[in-house]
């Protein structure tokens, strides 16, 4: 048999095997597209990532990061996002939240930190004219910045023999080094800074991360409080980008003097 007729005979079976016969057909449940019968589109939180439904006919919103997804009526997630199941809650079974496929914070070319590359892309699409040039990822991880004192040490008034502490809360990237120093006055009248705790057996310094991301909190504990502990205490934070400092004052009243002052007050005034 000539080759050409044989090839023509084999084409129908090849088409069935490769699924070419169904190519171009719509989903079995889809009717001919009539866009005038499409439901009124609801306002999309991110209209630039809208798409068509499964039948390729009616406009449909794609979920932005954090939007509900999945289930019979849930939206599809936008590009770069995946639908992750919820850990718990009252949400319908089979639904989830749109999360970025690439996890981790990033630093944008605008100097701002974004929770994910998807959040950065959303910002770039939302306000393209607000930035000189195209907003893009500058580096993985949050943007670096100099320390900022969020909660400075407060002034303290107390009597000798008690326990007191000063705290200092700082935010910075990378993590700063926090030190405590006390203003010292020499007999000649000059001022200097003494790094603590030094040789003081009644002073301890502690540092821990938190309470939030990129924050560090440090305490200086004085126990027992002595009259010579009175003065100004500086909280100093520094990293590779810069430094910041704040201070608090400790005022100490001698306990014996306090008792004598208290006992000298007439009874009718107490």
From Swiss-Prot:
Gene3D superfamilies: 3.30.60.30, 4.10.40.20, Immunoglobulins (2.60.40.10). Disulfide bonds join 30-55, 33-57, 38-58, 44-61, 69-83, 77-98, 107-143, 168-235. Residues 26-101 form the IGFBP N-terminal domain. Keywords: Disulfide bond, Glycoprotein, Immunoglobulin domain, Secreted, Signal. Residues 147-251 form the Ig-like C2-type domain. The keyword Cell division does not apply. Residues 1-17 form the signal peptide. Pfam families: I-set, IGFBP, Kazal_2. It is found in: Secreted. IGF-binding proteins prolong the half-life of IGFs and have been shown to either inhibit or stimulate the growth promoting effects of the IGFs in cell culture. They alter the interaction of IGFs with their cell surface receptors. This is Insulin-like growth factor-binding protein-like 1. It comes from Mus musculus (Mouse). The gene is Igfbpl1.
